[in-house]
Structures are given as structure tokens and as C-alpha cells.
């Protein structure tokens, strides 16, 4: 919230949630309590109705270590009139295609990236893409995939690998260590 590249923050919260309102951040005038959907893409689609800016950045709470430098990398692209851009990191590990726990083949990694958030798009295009995905019951794992379905090209912006997704207890331990050492 102390970033010059971010305006208001809409937090998608389910109707059943009793925790968000107890957080200090929920009382910040720049934080707007939005609607929660069944799926992540539903939450984003529902809350885009309240966005009046030309561009929107979509982020998720599972990536709390986003840097201001990465936010700036996305924000400056709005001057170039791009459809959208996502933060990502080049894959450095060897990739294996697997079926029934058996290795099928090694997948070339030269053009592979791990998609991160935030992802930034022209608001009207993202609305259109998510409405299309919803109407056609498409499984959307990130906002860029909804844009791809309609043929909108987005840019890859090399992001900080410290902006990893917290999904396991080990991820949480690593994040705590990074915060303690000031690496966020």
C-alpha cells in the first residue's frame, strides 16, 4: 500500500469470511472489501465491475513478497499501450512430462517461464476475457490464460524469484526467513 504504482486495492472476500474485518489493513481507506467468487477467476471478474482505471493489476495473497521494483516494471508499460503483461521467472530446472508417475519425456525449458502475479491488463480486455471464460465454462488458472483464449498477446516481464507462491509449510518457512533477513 505504500507503493506509488498502486492506487486502491480490492480484496476479494467470501461472504462467509469473518477474519478480514478483524485485520488492521481492512480499515485502510485505500483497501476496498470486494466480492469473493467460487473460483479465483470468478473473484477477479466480479470485482472488475468496480474498476474505473484503464489498467488493472491482479495479485493474489499467496504471493506476499512482491517488490516495488517488480510493480514498477509493470506500471511503466502502461505508457506503451500494451494489452497486458505478467511477472514471470525463467524455468531453470529440467522439466519432465509424466503420466501415471512414469516419465514420458523431457520437455525443453528454453522458452518456459513460471507465471507470477501481479498480472496487469487493460481493464476492459480482461473483463471481456473473463466473461468469455465464465460463459464458456473454461478452466482459467491465471488471468493471462483468459486473455490468451481471446488471442490477446501479453508481455513477459522478468520478475524477482522471491515473489514465489506460498503453498506448502516449507514455503512459509522460507518466506519468514526472507522477511527476517530483509530480502522482500
Feature annotation, model-predicted:
Residues 1-53, 134-136:
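Conserved N-terminal catalytic core of the sugar/cofactor nucleotidyltransferase
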Residues 15, 90-93, 161, 170:
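Glycine-rich beta-alpha junction loops
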Residues 3-4, 26-28, 79-81, 149-151:
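Short, well-ordered coil/turn elements that cap or connect secondary structure elements
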Residues 7-9, 83-84, 153:
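Residues at the starts of beta-strands that form the adenosine-phosphate
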Residues 96-119:
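Short, flexible, basic/aromatic active-site loop/helix in glycosyltransferases
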Residues 30, 39-100:
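Conserved beta-loop-beta/alpha segment of the NTase-like Rossmann-fold superfamily
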Residues 63, 84-86, 104, 118, ...:
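A residue-level structural signature of the nucleotidyltransferase/glycosyltransferase Rossmann-like core
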Residues 53, 113-184:
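Conserved alpha/beta core of the MobA/IspD/sugar-nucleotide pyrophosphorylase nucleotidyltransferase superfamily
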Amino acid at each position: 500500500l505504500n507503493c506509488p504504482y498502486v492506487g486502491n486495492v480490492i480484496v476479494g472476500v467470501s461472504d462467509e469470511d469473518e477474519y478480514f474485518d478483524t485485520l488492521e489493513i481492512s480499515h485502510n481507506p485505500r483497501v476496498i472489501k470486494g466480492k469473493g467468487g467460487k473460483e479465483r477467476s470468478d473473484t477477479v471478474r466480479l470485482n472488475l465491475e468496480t474498476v474505473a482505471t484503464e489498467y488493472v493489476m491482479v495479485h493474489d495473497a499467496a504471493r506476499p513478497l512482491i517488490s516495488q521494483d517488480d510493480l514498477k516494471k509493470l506500471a511503466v508499460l502502461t505508457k506503451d499501450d500494451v494489452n497486458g503483461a505478467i511477472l514471470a521467472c525463467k524455468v531453470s530446472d529440467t522439466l519432465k512430462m509424466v503420466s501415471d508417475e512414469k516419465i514420458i519425456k523431457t520437455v525443453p525449458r528454453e522458452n518456459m517461464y513460471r507465471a507470477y502475479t501481479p498480472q496487469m491488463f487493460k481493464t476492459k480486455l480482461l473483463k471481456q476475457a473473463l466473461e468469455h471464460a465464465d460463459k464458456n465454462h473454461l478452466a482459467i488458472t491465471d488471468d493471462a490464460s483468459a486473455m490468451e483464449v481471446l488471442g490477446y498477446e501479453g508481455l513477459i516481464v522478468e520478475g524477482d524469484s522471491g515473489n514465489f507462491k506460498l503453498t506448502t509449510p516449507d514455503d512459509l518457512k522460507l518466506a519468514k526467513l526472507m522477511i527476517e533477513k530483509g530480502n522482500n
